[in-house]
Amino acid sequence: MSQASALRAPTPQALPPMAREQALRPDVNEAHVRFIGLGKTYPGQAQPALQGIDLNIRHGEIFGIIGRSGAGKSSLLRTINRLEQPSQGRVLIDQVDIAPFNEDQLVALRRRIGMIFQHFNLMSAKTVWQNVELPLKVAGVAKAERQRKVRELLELVGLQEKHHVYPAQLSGGQKQRVGIARALVHTPEILLCDEATSALDPETTASILELLRDINQRLGLTIVLITHEMAVIRDICHRVVVLERGAVVEQGEVWRVFGSPRHEVTRTLLAPLQAKLPAALQASLQAHPASGNSAVVLKLTVLGEPELSALFNDLGGRVRLLQGGVETIGEHALGQLILSVQHSPHDTHQLLERARRWAEDVEVLGHVD
């Protein structure tokens, strides 16, 4: 049996009755996880941790949740496997409301939802093999089946040669790979990642992201992750939601949100990823034109690589490219251009309208002489 077939999602017969029909006809555009009017207030706290969350997470996508500290990211993530019980609203998994689940149903649900953590949560007195095998032993899985599953999972995460060692002998990245293998032992449909790369160096983070991407593609898992590292969202996620004080303030495809953030919170979170203006330009920027010879400085976010000569001709006047670059997010190339426009025949309003013909987003940075 191949790894992919051995680790594929549970058969419809293993799902709750209401979800079986959905599983027989999965649609990547249908909601795998759906939040409806979700709210959460902790005892003794006046400010809700979550409020009015309406959100869909699609089958097979990698979905990111970002926000400032205390925005409600972990609270939202933990409602998916009901480690947190909402105060209001509903959480639906494959169109099934999980709120009324009893203990047996919750056990079955949590076996369908794997979870990995920032600090690995491995048992130091057990080997790599034993750490991965433990949930299967607790579930009463036969020894032969346990051995087969653990062997396949350790091969999947690239640790088959480390099966006999203890966590203290592993690097941080290797420990997280053990955590990922353990999270997959019950062949889940959903994988929750709670700051899974925050304790890792950049090189190790990249390798873990590549592993998660491979698992997503090969096994068809829906992956939901929270992180404070915006580069992680950019590099791996298909869509993203931004939370602030427990509410959704922005959501969409990653390339659109990162290329043209609309909300102030989103712009603040993404600021470290933005190319910095040259120091000389930053120092010379003024809020208003100082004279008739002043040039307006524009930042344009464009899809693909525009024909600069045609863009400059459309803007009119004397146009200078002060800074530019292109990066790829997902399958989309996004360019960022910093231009100064002097003596344009168009007033500022007309100039911005013309710039928007070419750009996903246009921002006036200021004026320079």
From Swiss-Prot:
**CDD domains in the cross-refs:** ABC_MetN_methionine_transporter (cd03258)
Subcellular localization is given as: Cell inner membrane
Membrane topology annotation? Peripheral membrane protein
Stored SMART domains: AAA, NIL
Identify which top EC class this enzyme belongs to: translocase
Stored Gene3D superfamilies? 3.30.70.260, P-loop containing nucleotide triphosphate hydrolases (3.40.50.300)
The principal localisation class reads membrane
InterPro entries per the record?
A: AAA+_ATPase (IPR003593), ABC_transporter-like_ATP-bd (IPR003439), ABC_transporter-like_CS (IPR017871), ACT-like_dom_sf (IPR045865), MetN_ABC (IPR041701), MetN_ABC_transporter-like (IPR050086), NIL_domain (IPR018449), P-loop_NTPase (IPR027417)
What are the UniProt keywords, alphabetically?
Amino-acid transport, ATP-binding, Cell inner membrane, Cell membrane, Membrane, Nucleotide-binding, Translocase, Transport
Q: Which residues form the ABC transporter domain?
A: 33-270
Residues engaged in binding ATP: 67-74
Subunit description: The complex is composed of two ATP-binding proteins (MetN), two transmembrane proteins (MetI) and a solute-binding protein (MetQ).
Q: What does this protein do?
A: Part of the ABC transporter complex MetNIQ involved in methionine import. Responsible for energy coupling to the transport system.
Query: What's this protein's family per the entry?
Result: Belongs to the ABC transporter superfamily. Methionine importer (TC 3.A.1.24) family.
**Protein name per UniProt:** Methionine import ATP-binding protein MetN 2
Q: Which gene encodes it?
A: metN2
